[in-house]
Structure formats: structure tokens, C-alpha cells
Amino acid sequence: MPELPEVEVISRGLAESLEGKTIESVKILNHSSVKMPWYLFSSRVAGEKITRIHRRAKLLIMDLGDDLHITFHLKMTGRVLAHEGPTTPEPHTRIVFGLTDGGSIEFHDTRKFGEVRALNNEELQEWDFYKNLGPEPLEVTAEELAERITGRKAQIKGLLLNQSVVAGCGNIYADESLFRSGIHPKAKASDLSNESLVKLFTELQAVLKQAIQENGSSIRDYVDAGGDAGGFQNSFKVYGKKGEPCPDCGKIFEGATVAGRTSTFCSNCQKMKD
């Protein structure tokens, strides 16, 4: 699933090529991708100018004028691609937006879990998913993020994945930041010192920034707005490396299910508190 860095990279690429352009037509090839009446979606979007493209958490948001927003929740396999000319739909193309300059935007989604909406300002602000999002981890300090979870008895990895606690963090960047800060994914936040929590969020911020610089992580499906793969997967220290030696101490990485997600960690470098 594309996480904060991947969606940020996509939004920057799309903004560069699409802001200021006008949507001429909408072709919906899979109605289940549009989480509202398809005819309302089409009528709202056609003829509107793209004024801004940005990200909130894992959402890609395309502003149309002052009071309309196309939101793309990419889920597992969603992609949004910009083309300079018309595009021939592929088997997994779900929506095609035609532009007045002859270009096109393609929403591609192999597994059909992605969700697309066209919402006005009021609808966006009242959408439960959107209004319950926590702070952006790159827009507040590590100290502020630490304060949000100090004393909570939940497992630290579950808190990192909780979008109401910190927006945009997923499995990849949770594992990477926990390893780099020496914290076991099953540790309870209440058992961690403020110093440890600040270090965790400092590492999370560093990992997210590095991933954005390296164009995101491509494991299976992710590509940027131009169709290019990311490179941060080559910088993984722990994610997906169960059974391999820890680069810091040589002990074999272990795996466990934490907060319903597969986790990889080093039991030597990330010790549980006795």
C-alpha cells in the first residue's frame, strides 16, 4: 500500500504536470472505484480546472476550483498516472480523465480496493475518515508527536499505524523507524521514556524524508506519476528481511504479527523491557 512518502511523490509529480489544466471528460470503467453515484461524480468533475494537487495522510487530493476536491485513496494497488496524450485503457484502468489540452489522467487499480470521490468543502470536512486523521508527522515536532502517545498502554507499532495518532505512517515506515530507534514493535508506549519516544519520532521523520528523496518504495505495484519505480526499498534496514542478519549486530531478524500486520525486528537491538 502506498504510504506517506509514495503519495507525496505522486502528488508532487502530478502537481508539476497537471496544475492549471482543465478536465474535459470522465470515463468510468469500473463503477465500484467511485464511492458515490457515478453520474454525480462525472457531472461535478467535467469542465473543472485543476488548481492544486496535494496530499493528506495517504490521500491524494486534487483541488478543482475553490469548492471541489477529487480524493484518491490508493489502498493496495492504486496508481494515478499523467499522460501527455490520450491513453488506451489497460485491463486494470478504472477511470480516465480527458484534459482539454489532449492529455489524460489514468486511475489504475489491479485489485480494485482503491476509492475515488468528488467532494465539496463541507463534504470533505465531514467525511469521517478525513476529519479523524491525526497530525502530519513532517509538519509537527517529534516532541509533539511523542506527547500524543505518552502513557498509552497500547503497543507502539499499533499506535504508529493508527491514522488518528499520526497520519500517513504504514507498515514499512513503522518497522524502519522502530528498528532505527531500537524499540521493539510490541513495546507499550507507557513503558517507553519520553526520550525514547522523541527518538522514535525523530527517526520516523528522517525515514519519511529519505524515502521521499528516493522516490518512495517499490515492492510490487507502486510507481510515481510518470510510471517510474521508487528506490527506497534498496535502503530498507529491516522491513521484509525476516531470516536475514541484522546489519548492526548480525543476529537473525525475527517476525511477528503486531496490530494485525507482519512485523520484522531484531530481538537484540530492539529488546523488550523486562
Curated annotation (Swiss-Prot):
Binding locations of DNA: 92, 111, 152
Matches recorded under PROSITE patterns: FPG_CAT (PS51068), ZF_FPG_1 (PS01242), ZF_FPG_2 (PS51066)
Reported cofactor(s): Zn(2+)
Cofactor note: Binds 1 zinc ion per subunit.
Zinc finger extent (FPG-type): 237-271
Keyword Hydrolase among record annotations: yes
UniProt GO molecular function: 8-oxo-7,8-dihydroguanine DNA N-glycosylase activity; class I DNA-(apurinic or apyrimidinic site) endonuclease activity; damaged DNA binding; zinc ion binding
CDD domains tied to this protein: EcFpg-like_N (cd08966)
Superkingdom of this protein's organism: Bacteria
Keywords: DNA damage, DNA repair, DNA-binding, Glycosidase, Hydrolase, Lyase, Metal-binding, Multifunctional enzyme, Zinc, Zinc-finger
SMART domains: Fapy_DNA_glyco (SM00898), H2TH (SM01232)
Biological process annotations from GO: base-excision repair
Record's catalysed reaction(s): Hydrolysis of DNA containing ring-opened 7-methylguanine residues, releasing 2,6-diamino-4-hydroxy-5-(N-methyl)formamidopyrimidine; 2'-deoxyribonucleotide-(2'-deoxyribose 5'-phosphate)-2'-deoxyribonucleotide-DNA = a 3'-end 2'-deoxyribonucleotide-(2,3-dehydro-2,3-deoxyribose 5'-phosphate)-DNA + a 5'-end 5'-phospho-2'-deoxyribonucleoside-DNA + H(+)
EC numbers: 3.2.2.23, 4.2.99.18
Active-site residues, as the UniProt record annotates them: 2 (schiff-base intermediate with dna), 3 (proton donor), 58 (proton donor), 261 (proton donor)
InterPro entries reported for this sequence: DNA_glyclase/AP_lyase_DNA-bd, DNA_glyclase_Znf_dom_DNA_BS, Formamido-pyr_DNA_Glyclase, FPG_cat, MutM-like_N-ter, Ribosomal_uS13-like_H2TH, Znf_DNA_glyclase/AP_lyase, Znf_FPG/IleRS
Keyword Zinc-finger annotated: yes
Subunit structure: Monomer.
Function noted in UniProt: Involved in base excision repair of DNA damaged by oxidation or by mutagenic agents. Acts as a DNA glycosylase that recognizes and removes damaged bases. Has a preference for oxidized purines, such as 7,8-dihydro-8-oxoguanine (8-oxoG). Has AP (apurinic/apyrimidinic) lyase activity and introduces nicks in the DNA strand. Cleaves the DNA backbone by beta-delta elimination to generate a single-strand break at the site of the removed base with both 3'- and 5'-phosphates.
Protein family per UniProt: Belongs to the FPG family.
Name recorded for this polypeptide: Formamidopyrimidine-DNA glycosylase
Native source organism of the sequence: Maridesulfovibrio salexigens (strain ATCC 14822 / DSM 2638 / NCIMB 8403 / VKM B-1763)
